[in-house]
């Protein structure tokens, strides 16, 4: 029996095959916005997340335009949009809608295993692509990272443990994302940020913390560890006061 990640990657292979049958990439270039620049100060990457395998439906019928406008108004440095349909109930249409509404950097959050997905994300308006080390071979990761650069985009290379971190460091990527969630079990452990953050601080690499960030205390924890930003989905999608969450992120340490 495979892990949750195995099931997701198997589904992505089917989606990629379908894309090659139905989608022709657009050749024209466009301007992009920089997450690296946004991370010059502590930044919240605020996520549009309808559902997840671990939580089920979170905010299934969210008005993407309204949510993105709220995020930007509250001071988000970037917006992340889940585009996976099968497991997270997102879509490239959600990404395109966010692009129409937002002037800040936009992250395509998906399980990218092929260049054609990057083409699709680019056309929908993404500025940043998530590349998950756990979902890719070293060779494929390097190939996709090079393609992200070729398209004029930035990448967040996501890791969960020491082994994945060493693979990511070899790329010297724009940004490394420490995912506190184990994608094989979907369990969350915020201490991963502190553990892996030490190594990234030694390397003087730009990094953010992802998953399991719900409170002011969590923000203080990741700031102290050296993170330059946080990617937050569920906490914002279920919050009765998004503004308060952003105010908490301004805490000095």
Curated annotation (Swiss-Prot):
Pathway as given in its UniProt record: Amino-acid biosynthesis; L-tryptophan biosynthesis; L-tryptophan from chorismate: step 4/5
Instruction: Name the domain of life this protein comes from.
Output: Bacteria
Could you state one GO biological process linked to this protein? L-tryptophan biosynthetic process
Q: Which top-level enzyme class is recorded in the Swiss-Prot or TrEMBL entry?
A: lyase
Q: What are the protein's GO molecular function terms?
A: indole-3-glycerol-phosphate synthase activity; phosphoribosylanthranilate isomerase activity
Q: Does the keyword field hold Chaperone?
A: no
Record keywords, A-Z: Amino-acid biosynthesis, Aromatic amino acid biosynthesis, Decarboxylase, Lyase, Tryptophan biosynthesis
EC number per UniProt:
4.1.1.48
Catalyzed chemical reaction(s) = 1-(2-carboxyphenylamino)-1-deoxy-D-ribulose 5-phosphate + H(+) = (1S,2R)-1-C-(indol-3-yl)glycerol 3-phosphate + CO2 + H2O
Q: Does the keyword Amino-acid biosynthesis apply?
A: yes
- By its UniProt entry, which HAMAP family does this protein fall under? IGPS_B
Q: Which PANTHER family match?
A: INDOLE-3-GLYCEROL-PHOSPHATE SYNTHASE, TRYPTOPHAN BIOSYNTHESIS PROTEIN
Can you tell me which family this protein belongs to?
Belongs to the TrpC family.
By what name is this protein known? Indole-3-glycerol phosphate synthase
